[in-house]
């Protein structure tokens, strides 16, 4: 029984297939779609008329979409739709036809229909299969490279709802290759055991508080105790998104840039910037940034590789030797651990950086993975790779204060967190603080002690804020609420017994930390330290860029490197074009190399490879009605 309204779908399918006088019964998977083909006395009959086909479709909730998928795309080549398109591509095309109200026989438009009011960026931020782009409107660096394959394809992808790409085997191999390179430079510290054990202690503490509440009789006492329990739970293992971002900034900015300055290289470093579509420029000074924040678009990226070196003598490591000779480390009583005071380190290293700033430079490299020792053939792809690393250089320079001072990096990091709906002053959970301490104790233990004691860390904006907010009223950041007395000994004992790295917490979890802190650990602290480390790199900024091509099937070896010089004017020109595209002030530019159309999900309806197709002269109403059924 065809439900009311389904006739519309059938009529739509009928019109869509009207260009096919007849087609073979073998082209339809009758079992899959529950199609009951007419009986015919001629057992050899393989053709059925369109009317016959449409009469016998028995719609059920389970097969409606599948039938539409099979019919909605023109089978111009005579091939089965299931052989030509994957499910994702069918959905992508179906969504686009619906959005653009495309009728049978019409090709996709070359510009946005007038009834769609959203710009490409607004649509990307409103209708996106990756909901994180809806909750946190932003672009990646690669999204600015709209021309790298076909701008029209990017345009269609956006208005089809930006379907998430299914990870291919090649993509997986590329991810594994990047991780392998990362681990060659940065040790992976296992914190699973400490998180698990901390969770167990936290749950014991919470259960104890709950049992205490059950012993109370006075309603006011119960209400007060429940409020205390809520705060305790949040303190011990709450603030999950803030804690996650703290880990990202600690591991992918602070730790990485500290490693760069001390050892000459770092991998996988987070960068971001803010693009003004109106001016078509990335904001690079604090005044403009604070004045126009609401009009700026967040653009994020990850630098694959940073190398700090002497371009005239790549064997020269004298700066790093001087750093090791002049920087003071503190050792534990049994010399198992060494710690550095970041505040003092930044002071001590300043004259060394000034001495070597004319000699040493930072080169920025992006790593591309291939399945064979061959570069991409398309010039647009090679050019996009170059521009991608130029964007990284541009954003790294802005965060380092290339055009302003240290404050701009700090404010941009805070704004980044706020745009992700994070509270930069919400205390990081005790659980995360302990895991971060294990993974990064060399560079943050002394900072933990400073915060606990209410001391300045040497960054004026952060210190001034902390003085005004906490030192007169205090904070509720208290490690003793989970680790005190015998709990501490038991906690450390369990960690020692299970820790795979042989890590000794006994000399780290001292009374200097296990107390009520005067200044809590927050994202604001991590933004402050991140901006200081970015600023440390400012004197070494250079025009040296490169792209490395690695073969993932030959032990990830680098088989070719392209070297470039940073060109700010080129970036400005490309950014202007990208801004006009995303802001909707110009239509997309079609591809000229038609061989690319062979790899496009929209080629069957696109007028560029099919100039004989009708360009939509008007947009019918069928598409909008189809939304109710597909």
Curated annotation (Swiss-Prot):
- The record's disulfide annotation reads none
Q: Which InterPro entries match?
A: Exo5, EXOV
An example GO CC term for this entry is: nucleus
Alphabetically sorted, this entry's keywords are: 4Fe-4S, DNA-binding, Exonuclease, Hydrolase, Iron, Iron-sulfur, Magnesium, Metal-binding, Mitochondrion, Nuclease, Transit peptide
Q: Which cofactor does it need?
A: Mg(2+); [4Fe-4S] cluster
> Which Gene Ontology molecular-function terms are recorded?
4 iron, 4 sulfur cluster binding; DNA binding; metal ion binding; single-stranded DNA 5'-3' DNA exonuclease activity
Q: Which residues bind [4Fe-4S] cluster?
A: 150, 597, 600, 606
Source organism (scientific name): Debaryomyces hansenii (strain ATCC 36239 / CBS 767 / BCRC 21394 / JCM 1990 / NBRC 0083 / IGC 2968)
Query: Is Mitochondrion a UniProt keyword of this protein?
Result: yes
Q: Where in the cell is it found?
A: Mitochondrion
EC number(s) per entry: 3.1.-.-
Q: Does the keyword Protein biosynthesis apply?
A: no
Q: Which GO terms describe its biological process?
A: interstrand cross-link repair; mitochondrial genome maintenance
The text of the family note is: Belongs to the EXO5 family.
How does the annotation summarize its subunit structure? Monomer.
Q: How is the cofactor bound?
A: Binds 1 [4Fe-4S] cluster.
Q: Which gene encodes it?
A: EXO5
Q: Where is the transit peptide?
A: 1-24
- Could you identify this protein by its name? Exonuclease V, mitochondrial
